[in-house]
């Protein structure tokens, strides 16, 4: 099913043409000049949402650019689409589904009727079940088959059932307070599971199998191998004490041997990449507890309310999404670097890759017609200062335009003094954060370098051209609430871009064919006798070489 109403071509609108002309006018105007012409922009082009201070002044935009981008958003009916999403309309048109990840963090006393049900009651029933279970786990009331307390939960999932929990656990592991750690298995490569289980005791290990349908190939393959590891040590009867499921398929969960009382459900209106604040976050709740998890959800809700109510001119996710679109469609940027100056956010860029690229990596609009402009930013990145010694060279002096998001915190969870005694290691980290955004924006001219006595032959090599844009996001401290706020800002950026491009940001048909083809190829590479010839010579040769190196005939 596609959208019943044709979607106007945004690139054929006066608002798009006005932005094109505006780009021609401001051209390559340097950020040095933009700041000189508008010296207060460093204070004015900021927005505070919850605990997040967001500075977007170091972008190659003027106040006129912002006004024109807002006009574009209104031309695309962003606010109406936003209201439809929050109301539970079926805006995932290709699958005829509501899109209600925002309902996962509504307070208990809220009401949202969708398809005849108050989904808030359903959400909190699951949250209560999660809380009761994790309370028992954390207190030691729930034990393994031998009576020992559980000390490690292993989440088995893939995609949204893995990337979100991995990232959040890494970010909030300092809040783990009950002696329970979490590990994660996603890859069907056996090395992943083998390494994860190598030093674990089956008697103190609990597995969470996270699969909506309970039929995902990678997840069920790993879960079956994990069950074998457990039963080899403790016997078949131990499965019910050492496995729980996050799924909607009670029959398959029961067939696997998991007690159906230990199923934590979710709904088809929650996409995998938007599900870390659902039962998919059970491993996180087990580690940090239900109260900290509630704080995590409250952070999402703070930004949800801001996005739902603020006009585009002062709406942080909308503005950042529109700025991203400005670079993608008018300045030719193809990627965005995500640079958290926090070791705890080591997995944040990987998480955002799925959130953004699976959502907006589309070439077909929601009405089934082809898009008429580039869509989908390529997200990548690394924590600072590691990235500075890896790829910042390209950001500073390369030929490609790469807008960057810098994320930092004023107060670390832990800190150490520097050897010199001037501040702390965290101060040193954040001095790099501020310096990098400054140098990217303003650079250093040949004249400035020559004035320092640099040999003339070396001057061109040391020129820092600047005019490289960035967003700075600063919060006091990385808490569960702040992490929820940060994720929600990016969720709603994705939505904003998708609305303007006219695409369905909530399906992912592009991942299906490869999975189907893999199932078809598995018997080809494992069967006895000569394999079926493939339709292309490359795949055929690869399959035959693989079979030979595995000692199989044909």
Curated annotation (Swiss-Prot):
Residues 527-540 have a biased composition (Polar residues). GO terms for cellular component: cytosol. Its main location: cytoplasm. Signal peptide: none annotated. It comes from the Bacteria. Pathway: Carbohydrate biosynthesis; gluconeogenesis; Carbohydrate degradation; glycolysis; D-glyceraldehyde 3-phosphate and glycerone phosphate from D-glucose: step 2/4. Its EC number is 5.3.1.9. It catalyses: alpha-D-glucose 6-phosphate = beta-D-fructose 6-phosphate. Residues 544-554 have a biased composition (Basic residues). Residues 527-554 are annotated as: Disordered. Keywords: Cytoplasm, Gluconeogenesis, Glycolysis, Isomerase. GO terms for biological process: gluconeogenesis; glucose 6-phosphate metabolic process; glycolytic process. It is found in: Cytoplasm. It is an enzyme of class 5 (isomerase). GO terms for molecular function: carbohydrate derivative binding; glucose-6-phosphate isomerase activity; monosaccharide binding. The active site is at residues 358, 389, 515. Catalyzes the reversible isomerization of glucose-6-phosphate to fructose-6-phosphate. Belongs to the GPI family. HAMAP family: G6P_isomerase (MF_00473). This is Glucose-6-phosphate isomerase.
């Amino acid at each position: 099913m596609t959208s019943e109403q044709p979607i106007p071509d945004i690139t054929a609108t006066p608002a798009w043409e006005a932005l094109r002309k505006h780009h021609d006018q401001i051209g390559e105007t340097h950020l040095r000049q933009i700041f000189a012409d508008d010296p207060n922009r460093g204070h004015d082009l900021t927005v505070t949402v919850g605990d997040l201070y967001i500075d977007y002044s170091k972008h190659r935009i003027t106040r006129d650019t912002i006004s024109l981008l807002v006009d574009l958003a209104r031309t695309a009916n962003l606010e109406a689409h936003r209201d439809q999403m929050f109301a539970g309309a079926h805006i995932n048109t290709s699958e005829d589904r509501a899109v209600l990840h925002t309902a996962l963090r509504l307070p208990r006393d809220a009401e949202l009727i969708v398809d005849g049900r108050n989904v808030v009651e359903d959400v909190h029933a699951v949250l209560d079940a999660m809380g009761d279970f994790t309370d028992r786990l954390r207190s030691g009331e729930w034990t393994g088959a031998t009576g020992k307390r559980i000390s490690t939960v292993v989440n088995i999932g893939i995609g949204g059932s893995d990337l979100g929990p991995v990232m959040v656990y890494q970010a909030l592991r300092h809040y783990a307070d009950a002696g329970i750690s979490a590990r994660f298995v996603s890859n069907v490569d056996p090395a992943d599971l083998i390494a994860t289980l190598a030093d674990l005791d089956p008697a103190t290990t609990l597995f969470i199998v996270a699969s909506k349908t309970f039929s995902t190939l990678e997840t069920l393959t790993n879960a079956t191998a994990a069950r074998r590891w457990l039963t080899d040590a403790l016997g078949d009867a131990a499965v019910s004490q050492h496995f729980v499921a996050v799924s909607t398929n009670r029959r398959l969960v029961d067939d696997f041997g998991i007690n159906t009382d230990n199923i934590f459900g979710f709904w088809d209106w929650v996409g995998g990449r938007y599900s870390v604040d659902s039962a998919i976050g059970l491993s996180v709740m087990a580690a940090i507890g239900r109260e900290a998890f509630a704080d995590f959800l409250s952070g999402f809700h703070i930004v949800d309310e801001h996005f739902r109510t603020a006009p585009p001119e002062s709406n942080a996710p909308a503005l950042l999404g529109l700025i991203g679109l400005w670079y993608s469609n008018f300045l030719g940027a193809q990627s965005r670097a995500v640079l958290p100056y926090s070791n705890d956010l080591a997995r944040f860029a990987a998480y955002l890759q799925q959130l953004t690229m699976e959502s907006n990596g589309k070439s077909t609009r929601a009405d089934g017609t082809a898009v008429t402009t580039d869509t989908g930013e390529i997200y990548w990145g690394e924590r600072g200062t590691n990235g500075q010694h890896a790829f910042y060279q390209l950001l500073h002096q390369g030929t490609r335009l790469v807008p960057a998001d810098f994320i930092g915190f004023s107060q670390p969870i832990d800190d150490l003094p520097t050897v010199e005694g001037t501040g702390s290691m965290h101060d040193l980290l954040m001095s790099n954060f501020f310096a990098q955004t400054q140098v990217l924006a303003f650079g250093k001219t040949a004249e400035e370098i020559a004035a320092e006595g640099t040999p003339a032959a070396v001057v061109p090599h040391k020129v820092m051209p600047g005019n490289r844009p960035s967003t700075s996001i600063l919060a006091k401290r990385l808490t569960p609430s702040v992490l929820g706020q940060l994720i929600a800002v990016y969720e709603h950026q994705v939505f904003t871009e998708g609305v303007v491009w006219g695409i369905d940001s909530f399906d992912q048909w592009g991942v299906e064919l490869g999975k189907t083809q893999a199932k078809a190829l598995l018997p080809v590479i494992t069967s006895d006798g000569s394999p079926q010839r493939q339709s292309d010579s490359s795949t055929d040769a690869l399959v035959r070489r693989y079979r030979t190196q595995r000692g199989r005939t044909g």
